[in-house]
């Protein structure tokens, strides 16, 4: 209720942890959790918006996904990245074409969030996009995220991964080894 009254409310990290603990406790004793999307849309503070986007993901508020998708146009890279991550985890497949469309004009961290979200969606419609994204990527971290997405995407994703591996040079071959090795994969 207090977020409805003060849209400019600032939260410190500790406040967010406390608020999350209160929400968890209320859930355990049988109270319904509120719908967080209204505070994403009304809060004036970036960190508060990000907190509520994370809560949407943690509480699997799939009904908030269509409204949350509007945050893909947020000026803040952090808000945009968290919205992308959350939409992927919520399996909001309708967002995939928009993610592909916006990919090339995003900073590297947002590109990685887009790739991870597409991997979470697993629509089998993005294999061509992932293949091209790998070919065009010049950042090794981004290439690594793309390879992991392909490797875990589907049987066709694995075939695409194998195809890229066959044409890899000695410099990029290490990325494929790191993606396939289960111990290294756990470090993500």
Where are these regions (language model features)?
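Amphipathic alpha-helical scaffolding segments comprising HEAT/armadillo-like alpha-solenoid repeats
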Residues: 1-10, 29-41, 61-73, 92-104, ...
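Alpha-solenoid helical repeat scaffolds
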Residues: 3-57, 76-77, 85, 103, ...
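Alpha-helix N-cap/helix-start positions at coil->helix boundaries
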Residues: 12-17, 45-47, 62, 77-78, ...
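Alpha-solenoid HEAT/ARM repeat scaffold
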Residues: 16-20, 34, 49-50, 54, ...
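Core register positions within helices of long alpha-helical scaffolds
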Residues: 21-26, 55-58, 86-89, 117-120, ...
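Alpha-helical adaptor scaffolds
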Residues: 77, 81-85, 97, 101-108, ...
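Ankyrin-repeat and related helical/solenoid repeat scaffolds used for protein-protein interactions
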Residues: 104, 108-155
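Leucine-rich solenoid repeat scaffolds
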Residues: 147-168, 174-181
């Amino acid at each position: 209720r207090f977020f409805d009254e003060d849209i400019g409310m600032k939260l410190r990290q500790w406040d967010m942890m406390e608020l999350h603990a209160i929400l968890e406790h209320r859930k355990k004793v049988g109270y319904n959790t509120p719908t967080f999307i209204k505070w994403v849309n009304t809060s004036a503070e970036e960190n508060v918006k990000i907190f509520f986007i994370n809560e949407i993901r943690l509480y699997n508020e799939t009904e908030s996904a269509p409204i949350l998708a509007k945050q893909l146009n947020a000026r803040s890279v952090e808000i945009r990245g968290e919205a992308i991550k959350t939409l992927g985890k919520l399996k909001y497949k309708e967002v995939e074409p928009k993610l592909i469309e916006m990919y090339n004009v995003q900073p590297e961290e947002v590109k990685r969030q887009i790739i991870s979200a597409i991997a979470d969606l697993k629509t089998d419609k993005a294999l061509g996009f992932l293949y091209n994204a790998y070919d065009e990527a010049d950042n090794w971290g981004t290439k690594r995220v793309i390879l992991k997405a392909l490797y875990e995407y589907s049987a066709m994703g694995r075939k695409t991964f194998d195809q890229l591996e066959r044409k890899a040079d000695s410099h990029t071959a290490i990325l494929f080894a790191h993606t396939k090795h289960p111990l290294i994969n756990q470090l993500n």
